[in-house]
C-alpha cells in the first residue's frame, strides 16, 4: 500500500504483482528471487518490466504481420535478443575512500588530468593484472551460480576500465540479468579490496562506461 495521505484507504492502492514466467527465477543468498511485473488496477505500468514486456509483444505482433504479408506464413514468433556488454572501472578501495566525490556521486567532480590517459590504446585488450584477473574469475563463478552466462572479460580503452560480455539471450532476460550483473560486480569487487564504478562518466578526459 502507499500511505500518501489521500482520502482513499491505503489497502485500496490496488497494485498487482505478477510472476514473469519468461524470466528465470534464481536463488541469491539463500533467498528465492522471482522476477515479477507490477501494475495498477487499471493496467497502468508501475514498474520498468511491464513496458518492456508490452514492447516486445507489440514488436512481435507487428513484425509477424509484415512477415506474413511477404508470404512467410510458417513464421510463428519474432523475438529480440540482447547481449549487453557491461563496462566498468575498478578502483582500489583505499584510494576510493580518499575521494568524497567518488563516494557520494560515483564520479570525480574536480581534479587534475593524469600524466597519461588512454593515448596509444595500450590498455585496450592489454594484459590483465593478476588482481583484476582474480576479480574477474570470482565474478564469473558468482554469475554462473545465478544463471548469468558471463563469457568474455577484457581491458577497455581507459586506464582501470574493463568489460564483461555475457552470452546473448532474449531482451527481457538480458535486462534482468544485467541488473544482477551490476549488483554482483560491486559485491565481488569489495571482496577483492576494490570498488566497482558503474557511473557512465566517472572520470573526465577518458572514455565513459556503457552497455553496447
For each feature predicted by the language model, list its residue ranges:
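Glycine-rich, acidic/polar active-site loops that bind/position phosphate-bearing ligands
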Residues: 1-198, 206-211
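Short, basic/glycine-rich phosphate-binding loops at helix/coil junctions
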Residues: 203
Amino acid at each position: 500500500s502507499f500511505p500518501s495521505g489521500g482520502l482513499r484507504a491505503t489497502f485500496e492502492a490496488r497494485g498487482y504483482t505478477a510472476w514473469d514466467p519468461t524470466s528465470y527465477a534464481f536463488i541469491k543468498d539463500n533467498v528465492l528471487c522471482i522476477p515479477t511485473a507490477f501494475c495498477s488496477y487499471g493496467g497502468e505500468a508501475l514498474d520498468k518490466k511491464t513496458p518492456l514486456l508490452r514492447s516486445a509483444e507489440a514488436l512481435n505482433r507487428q513484425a509477424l504481420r509484415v512477415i506474413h504479408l511477404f508470404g512467410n506464413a510458417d513464421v510463428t514468433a519474432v523475438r529480440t535478443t540482447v547481449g549487453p556488454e557491461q563496462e566498468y572501472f575498478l578502483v582500489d578501495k583505499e584510494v576510493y575512500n580518499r575521494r568524497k566525490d567518488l563516494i557520494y556521486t560515483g564520479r570525480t567532480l574536480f581534479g587534475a588530468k593524469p600524466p597519461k590517459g588512454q593515448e596509444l590504446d595500450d590498455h585496450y585488450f592489454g594484459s590483465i593484472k593478476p588482481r583484476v584477473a582474480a576479480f574477474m574469475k570470482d565474478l564469473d563463478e558468482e554469475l554462473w551460480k545465478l544463471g548469468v552466462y558471463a563469457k568474455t572479460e577484457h581491458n577497455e580503452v581507459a586506464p582501470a576500465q574493463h568489460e564483461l560480455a555475457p552470452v546473448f539471450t532474449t531482451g527481457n532476460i538480458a535486462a534482468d540479468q544485467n541488473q544482477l550483473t551490476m549488483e554482483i560486480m560491486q559485491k565481488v569487487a569489495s571482496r577483492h579490496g576494490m570498488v566497482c564504478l558503474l557511473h557512465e562518466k566517472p572520470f573526465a578526459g577518458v572514455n565513459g562506461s556503457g552497455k553496447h
